[in-house]
Amino acid sequence: FIKIVELINKLTIIIITTIALVFNFDVYGLIFAYIAAGTLVIVLKFIYILKNKLFEFKFVRVSRKMYKSIIIFSGWNMVALLTQRLTYNIVPSLLGFFSGTAEIALFTIALSIEGYIWTFSNALNGLFLPKITKLNIDGKTEEINQTMVAVGRFQLFFMGLIILGFYLLGPEFVNLWVGEDLEPAALVGFFLVVTGLFTYTYGIAYTYLLVVKKVKYYALSLIISLVITLTSAVFLIPHYGALGASIAIFGGNLIGQVIIMNIFYHKIIGFNMIDFYKKVHLRSVIPMAVTLVFGIYIKQLIEEYSIKNLIIKIMLVSIVYVALSFIFVLTK
């Protein structure tokens, strides 16, 4: 129920933003709508928790070993969470030092888009924790792998549509949203999210890391990603501004969160990542490639920027992508 409420909240935010774009609401009305939606979600969660008695406090003696285990796990988890978002807080400062306010504005718009997409990608996180925990206790490793493939396909289907759609129609969306001058923010945003075609499909693998208390490997990969990002950003930002910053983040994410995490998953955790990519990503190549070509054709066919034309393009691209995905991915 809580995950469903969170997903509804995220959808509501997107709908509110779209309505604001169409009817030209002022910023105060938009902020009030966001606050109202967030408050409603908090109230619904609180009522659900009280009604179902999800928490019960018992004061019992806890062993030192358990304390140590909790502290270590919580520590690595905190490092992972902080490092994950630290990049996006440091990079604007580098942009201000090496480039200027114009590039910060571009990056801020791109970061807003990345935030929305990241929020959607995490809608299912934690939902399978009870199931994966039980399968691990029962020693059913093969079923965990099967669940990872099934959830990975769904995540790639859903997030693939969003990321591919943003690549095709992002410039038009940004143009209509914030104006022609900030349209380059679309390409900046694309580099921030494109590695999500891989990382967003690792939800079950990350959940398994939590279950077996090996989240430190995820934290280490994020630290490596952060170091690579900041090092390369210092060299790229003076020449390419916000685009250079996004390319630096792309490189850090690709090496740290994709390549290195795949090594951890395959060698240390024991997941067959090659088989995973064959069953998830390889099957999605045809739907994505055909949709990409079709989307480019539609953009050339309907060149004028308008809310109406953007909605038409989104619908056409979505129909083609969903139809092909059902044929080649979801029904197999």
Where are these regions (language model features)?
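Membrane-proximal transmembrane or re-entrant/amphipathic helices at the cytosolic face
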Residues: F271-M273, G295-K332
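Hydrophobic/aromatic end-of-helix segments at the C-terminal termini of transmembrane alpha-helices
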Residues: T87-L95, S99, F128-L129, L169-V174
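Hydrophobic alpha-helical transmembrane segments in multi-pass integral membrane proteins
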Residues: A80-Q84, L164, L230-V234, P287-E303
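Short runs within selected transmembrane alpha-helices of multi-pass transporters and secretion channels
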Residues: F1, V5-T17, L30-I47, A80, ...
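Interfacial/gating helices of multi-pass transporter permease domains
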Residues: V27-Y28, K65-N77, S93-G115, E143, ...
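Interhelical loop/hinge segments that connect adjacent transmembrane helices in multipass membrane
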Residues: V27, K45-Y88, L127, K131, ...
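Specific pore-lining/lateral-gate transmembrane helices of multi-pass inner-membrane transport
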Residues: L106-I223
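Helix-loop interface residues and adjacent transmembrane-helix termini in multi-pass membrane transporters
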Residues: N24, F98-T101, V211-V212, H239
